[in-house]
């Protein structure tokens, strides 16, 4: 029997990219393991931004409504095991190790037949099916890793898919999904199928037209959330209140994008009710009040105020800028910024950098896609001369706190990958 470290290494050391584009390897492994996915009911989420927030709202409400709910998500903030949850509790190390041993046996049978083994994400996806079947989940809410059509999560049989949800779509991962909004939308829409209702977040006009055409040509049922119908009552860093569809909502998630995510989740749950889910609208309102989702315009420190946000592409950067202007107009802003090299960091810098008084750049830890802080700083200098590369996250936090003083606001963004470490450092500093 492996230990936890060995089980993690077994998954992480598999080849990261399959051979031919497609889902053959994961389908063969599922066949080897008696198709655990066929015993489950899924709510499948694709999109560029907002997947995690919508997932969190839907799963929290379903749990509040008395259902046993599996969550499968990535990336994680605090623990690798965070990606496999039942009613908000992470998978245990013991269950993880035991199920990796099951995966390993299936992979070895594949390899003995000369069949290429699945990638790490495909293995994790199969593990989530095994775990949630064991846990007898009523619903599994899961988000795509990349795109939709060819994503490992799209092995779910359409008859097991109770709802498809499309969150905000914008340009990202263009080397894999296509270089236009139309191409990316069609990739994301690949999770929709016959008999599967779909709910979309409010979308850009080009995305909306592509979706309308795609769904009409295939005869798919869908509905879009309407952000213009949402009336914001109040917004602070602790909570936001708004009216929508005759209901008054309070959510704990700050930031202008979170109203959009909340109404998308609401419409998704209403669609499930329409198709037989036993849930009251009052339970949606109460459940959404309980939803927590860190790393999305989240305050992690009070003195000085420190906000963390996962914004890592131009669309998310525009929403981040909107939140900055709403919450911190006229305040001194200090940034800590780290990006991956395969992101459009130049456009993100153009959108965000002019608002800052000082910027400290960092590298995402333990990731070969991390953009060196010096290179990011060189790019940012086109839009703001006051930028300093830092060797470590701790160095950046200390420098940013000194620059912020008593009245400045520190804003950290660019990737979810370093938020866990940064949050821990900020908590240490706050209690020191």
Can you name each region flagged by the protein language model?
Residues 1-47, 53-67, 71-73, 108-116:
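Short functional linear segments
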Residues 136-138, 330, 405-407:
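Short, high-confidence coil segments that cap the C-terminus of an alpha-helix
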Residues 139-144, 151-165, 170-173, 183, ...:
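Nucleotide phosphate-binding/pyrophosphate-handling subdomain across enzymes
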Residues 110-111, 135-143, 160-248, 262, ...:
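Acidic, Mg2+-coordinating active-site environments of NTP-dependent enzymes
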Residues 30-31, 35-38, 64-159, 205-206:
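ATP-dependent carboxylate-amine ligase catalytic core
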Residues 415:
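Active-site-proximal loop/hinge segments that shape catalytic or ion-binding/gating pockets
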